[in-house]
Amino acid sequence: MSNIAVIGAGTSGYLSVLYFCTRYPEYNITWIYPEDNVTIGVGESTVPQVAEFLEDLGITPKEIINDIGGSLKLGIKFEDFVTTDYFHPFGIEDDEAALVEYIMKHNKIPDDIMSYDISFHFNVANLAKFLDNWFKRFDNLTIERKTVKSVDEVDCEWFIDCTGFTRAFVNEYYTDNLQSISNKVPNNAALVCRTNIPNNKRNAYTTCKAMDYGWIWNIPLRDELTLGYVHNDKYDVKDEFLNYLEREGLGSPELREVKMSTGRNKNHYKDLGNKKIASVGLSSAFIEPIESTGLYLTVFGIEKLDQLIHKKITADEYNSIVNYEYDVIVDFIAAHYKFGYRDNSYWNFYKNLSVELYKECAAYPTRSWNYVLQNKTLQVTELQKNKLKNAKPYSIWLNNYLKGQK
């Protein structure tokens, strides 16, 4: 196998090209997307697996912050979902997660923060521009700006379908291939905006704030703040969102509506004999952004596809692994809503929902469930606190980092 075609230029297309061009310089990679390509991306809040994916492929934290306009993400703060606000920090082991949560609460950053299991916020449009330049180093990459309607139009053995919510290729060969999750997580839209970032919003974490008919994300990028009100489109949330922005002193930025086609493919792969097609990213699966799983599921899918291509797993195993990871995450996300205190049609839907709890997957260990279901806080030892004596307020740390200082 030496020929791979990546079709589509959303974030999943960019990451697929980056992965296969880097890992397999002996392969011929063809990247095909239309001249009028439009991406859905907003400010992305990622998880450590995405940061590790990028770093393994040569993109350093310094480049993410300095060149892509990114910022630190140590975890997520959940406000007003239940009667007590809580944090869901990153960290490989309990001790590290406890320390990261402590750092989040004080918003002071130690000098060795890059050695922790952390991630980043970044603007996907900036990532795309950065990668456009990065890709110039690849001798094995051919870019064709055109519209492709059939895999028969391209002379390749493997096709990676990165066509987003249109799901243009794999689903062409299956009837009713998309499995909806509206019975568990019915959010299917977001009102989004960008604004200048005030100092009180410059945090080293994403904030998710529960509202009457959904929740609002605050993603503090390096130079701007992105916000989005995630909801089901049967509810009109515009006025509530505008009132929130006014209360927070964020003005009246222009709002943009993003529709989300949630669910997953039942089959992510089709073998046509001389041609093989696999879906990655939004064309494969999407839930909703509350735990920043969009790019995680993309990089998870790319890595499992690599195993399929090189026959380390079978097609059935590939489908099973991807679907299991997705299905557990759906339950994990639904659990965020199940114990909300609000009494209206939106929140009451979740109270009666059957959710399989404490089921682990690659993304979320039992500790993550404890944070969400019990709002559990791990204790920090005095020895750990001593490590943070010289920690700096995040805004100062970020400015120093940009200047190459500690």
Map each language-model feature to its residues.
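N-terminal Rossmann-fold NAD(P) dinucleotide-binding loop
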Residues: 13
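Glycine-rich FAD pyrophosphate-binding loop
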Residues: 21-42
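Dinucleotide-binding Rossmann-like beta1-alpha1 core, especially the glycine-rich loop
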Residues: 38-110
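Long, low-complexity C-terminal extensions of enzymes
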Residues: 307-406
